[in-house]
Amino acid sequence: MQENQELTKKEKYNIDKLQKRLRRNVGEAIADFNMIEEGDRIMVCLSGGKDSYTMLEILRNLQKSAPISFSLVAVNLDQKQPGFPEHILPAYLEQLGVEYKIVEENTYGIVKEKIPEGKTTCSLCSRLRRGILYRTATELGATKIALGHHRDDILQTLFLNMFYGGKMKGMPPKLMSDDGKHIVIRPLAYCREKDIERFSQAKGFPIIPCNLCGSQPNLQRQVIADMLRDWDKRYPGRIETMFSAMQNVVPSHLSDVNLFDFKGITHGSEVVDGGDLAFDREDIPLQPAGWQPEEEDARLDELRLNVVEVK
């Protein structure tokens, strides 16, 4: 009995620690990109997946202690997909006491009518969904639209564009919408997917399956996701370093003439970002930039014998 109680205490401690890390990540992203301002009305797009549930939970948590006042309204788009459990989200949100709106639009029927059987429906579905959410944001008087994309999504998008699109373009933590009328924010931009997965499981969110439409998954994105997961296992810190690289772009050492005036370089020009090292190799730090080991790993390191010093 005591062992079970201890296990429960340990689990609670781990959940609290995980929530603090997610809170810190979200808080830093909000501060770095000025995502939320005094008086903002944030439309939280809730799909019923782990990411959007976590985003809503952390934003609600931050709302209680934030130095500014802002409101949240959760919005779900019921696309009339077969088997969609309509009761789950209203019941969950009413239990929380969160203001919400369920938007009912038969985009599933439109997509099935327009797209031939066997072809991917994601592109058209995404455009329809985006338009409906923009309209809803206007109707609700929302000043920001919050989406649940996390750090792994952002990196996947970068590699997708590099491998298949021939451009270095990721997923912005904050940007104006393509219709020029709304500010879109991604509060989970600094959060790791594995942290979100663990938090979602611990909280027992009522997850709604994402494949109800029957569409095939994006195979290119899946390949990239698998590659990044493999790197994360084999080379701890690589994911953090790559994300850090997205925040430390050096245009003078790339090849985009629109970002840097290469043609304007003449004798007497100033040295930019260390200049050209010619045949010298750039110093690379031994420890991956932007990476810190898990607390558990750090504690294990403290317990290990330093075999070099043992006489």
Curated annotation (Swiss-Prot):
A motif (PP-loop motif) lies at residues 47-52. [4Fe-4S] cluster binds at C122, C125, C213. It is found in: Cytoplasm. Pfam families: ATP_bind_3. Its EC number is 2.8.1.-. SUPFAM superfamilies: Adenine nucleotide alpha hydrolases-like. Keywords: 4Fe-4S, ATP-binding, Cytoplasm, Iron, Iron-sulfur, Magnesium, Metal-binding, Nucleotide-binding, RNA-binding, Transferase, tRNA processing, tRNA-binding. Binds 1 [4Fe-4S] cluster per subunit. The cluster is chelated by three Cys residues, the fourth Fe has a free coordination site that may bind a sulfur atom transferred from the persulfide of IscS. Its main location: cytoplasm. The keyword Transferase applies. Catalyzes the ATP-dependent 2-thiolation of cytidine in position 32 of tRNA, to form 2-thiocytidine (s(2)C32). The sulfur atoms are provided by the cysteine/cysteine desulfurase (IscS) system. Homodimer. NCBIfam families: PRK10696.1. The thiolation reaction likely consists of two steps: a first activation step by ATP to form an adenylated intermediate of the target base of tRNA, and a second nucleophilic substitution step of the sulfur (S) atom supplied by the hydrosulfide attached to the Fe-S cluster. HAMAP family: TtcA (MF_01850). This is tRNA-cytidine(32) 2-sulfurtransferase. It comes from Klebsiella pneumoniae subsp. pneumoniae (strain ATCC 700721 / MGH 78578). The lineage of its organism: Bacteria, Pseudomonadati, Pseudomonadota, Gammaproteobacteria, Enterobacterales.
